[in-house]
Structures are given as C-alpha cells and as structure tokens.
A protein has these predicted regions:
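Conserved alpha/beta-hydrolase "acid-adjacent" motif
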Residues: 230-236
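Conserved hydrolase catalytic core segment
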Residues: 86-128
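Short beta-strand/loop motif that positions the catalytic acidic residue
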Residues: 217, 223-225
Length: 298
C-alpha cells in the first residue's frame, strides 16, 4: 500500500486503525477518497479502509469504459478478500452510495452494516431535480444551466474545473472560503480529480434505478444526509430509508452535501453510534426510525 493490484487494476488504498472493518466508498465519479478523510477519526475503534474507485483519483490501469457497477462492486469485494475480511461495514457517499447499494445487492453476505450518506436509489434526483432545486434557491440562470449539464455528464474535460468552481458554493449550507482554505491546508490539496470519469459516469447513470430492490437489503442500515443537500434533499432520503426494511434516518441540520465537512463532529458521532448500535433492530412499528444522538460521553 498505498496501491494494491486488484483484478488487474492498481487501486489506491489506505488502511488505518484497528477493530471491526469499515469501508468508505467516495463520491463523484471523478473524485477520490480525500473528502471522506474526516472518518479517519473512527480509527480508534474500527479498521478504516479508504480507496479510490477504478478510473478515479489515483487508481490506475483501467479504461474509463470499464467503470461499470459490475466492475466497481467486484473490485470492492476483491479488495475485501485481499485484506482478509469476511464481512465489513460499508459507508457510501453520493455516487459511492450508489456503488454501496449495488454492492449490498450483489454481495449481501459480505456486508455487516450499511451507511448511505447523501445518496439515492435512483439517478433522477441529481440528474433531473438538482438544477430545479438550485433555481428555487435563487441561483442564477447560468449556474442552473451548468448544473443541468454537469450532473448528466454533458460537459467537456476543459469545462470541468470551471463548472466545478461555479457549483462549489451550492454544496454547503453556508459556503465559507475560510473553511475551504482550512480544508485545503489539512489535506484537501491532495484531491485528484478525473474529469473523464465524471463525464462517463453521467452517461452511465442515466436511467439507473434500484428503488424496487431496496426491500432485499437485510442488513442494519443508516440513511444519513445534510438537510440542505440540493443533490439529495430530505424528501429523497425519506424515500430511500422507507424502502429499506427497518432503516434508520438521520438528517444533519445546517449541512449540505458534505456533512462530514460542515458538521464533522455530529456526523462522525452519528456514524459511530450507529455502528455500535446496529445490532439492535429499529422499532418494527415504524417504517423509518430516526437515530437520535446519544448522550454525551464523560
């Protein structure tokens, strides 16, 4: 490490900590695991595995056309086997949540707990509704038009950086250049983007939908999201949680698409508490249980 040969692809992998394993699947596509590094704080009680999907970040050796759910999930399971874990908890953020859903549906016996963070069971929220949500929040017509193209992969590599910066403030509850600068100094500068993966992913995701299969998920599941996420707003999270038997729903206030960055302590605590309590079934008389913060530890 930090690279491992998995199914003929060189995956960038970081493993930290000790305890029961937790795999982190990053979003994008076209990004890397850096946005999920706040979860390294769980390394005192879990073996935390961060990696870059094939064709993303610093993972190399695969053509972008190979970035299919079949390959992405097979890569993850081959990584599990290579690391010697029988089962592991899986946290998927945004696009990584789509991969996590595909993974638990294809390899159900390998997942002990599932955390779906700011994601959905279909593509329509990001590809069909995000631009309209931005318009409703008062964003200018140019930003709305960029969003309509960006999340469907209808941009060029040359447009990627410019479009990303235009959309950047929309990801937060309250955009802060100071916080962005701090995050960059704390390691955000290491993020490696791959525009070709975003462009291909936008096309790959068109029509993707596993909402009718959510009832097959039999592991303890937490649906976790920022209240002000324009890509996956609370109503999408309620639908996702309602479709998964006994799923728990937690909405983080004053946070957007990346609650792990805006409300770090609260988000990490929600994940830690869920992993500790996941063996306790959610109430059966309520389709979706809300996981309340635990009392402060001494």
């Amino acid at each position: 490490m930090p690279t491992m040969s998995i199914r003929g692809v060189s995956l960038f992998v970081e493993v930290v900590g000790h305890g029961s394993p937790l795999l982190l699947m990053h979003g994008g596509p076209g990004l890397d695991h850096v946005s999920l590094t706040p979860f390294r704080e769980l390394a005192d009680r879990h073996t935390v595995i961060l990696y870059d999907h094939r064709c993303n970040g610093r993972s190399t050796g695969a053509a972008v056309e190979s970035m299919t759910f079949e390959n992405l999930t097979a890569d993850a399971d081959a990584l599990r086997e290579a690391l010697g874990f029988e089962r592991w908890a899986v946290l998927g953020h945004s696009f990584g949540g789509h991969v996590a859903l595909e993974y638990v549906l294809r390899y159900p016996e390998r997942v002990s707990q599932l955390i779906l963070m700011d994601t959905a069971g279909d593509a329509r929220w990001s590809q069909e509704h995000a631009a309209e949500i931005l318009a409703g929040r008062g964003y200018d017509a140019k930003t709305v038009a960029v969003a309509r193209r960006f999340y469907c992969g209808r941009i060029t590599s040359n447009d990627f950086v410019r479009a990303s910066f235009r959309l950047l403030p929309a990801y937060d509850h309250q955009f802060s250049l100071l916080r962005l600068a701090r995050e960059m100094l704390e390691g955000g500068w290491r993020m490696k983007t791959r525009p070709e993966a975003l462009i291909f992913g936008g096309k790959m995701m068109r029509g993707w939908n596993v909402m009718d299969r959510l009832g097959e998920i039999g592991v303890p599941t937490l649906v976790l999201a920022g209240h002000d996420d324009f890509l996956f707003p609370p109503e999408s999270q309620a639908l996702l949680a309602a479709g998964i038997p006994n799923a728990r729903l937690r909405i983080i206030e004053r946070a957007g698409h990346n609650p792990q960055s805006e409300r770090t302590a609260e988000t990490i605590r929600a994940v830690a508490d869920f992993l500790a309590l996941a063996t306790v079934p959610a109430p059966r008389d309520v389709g979706t249980a809300v996981l309340r913060p635990a009392p402060a530890r001494a």
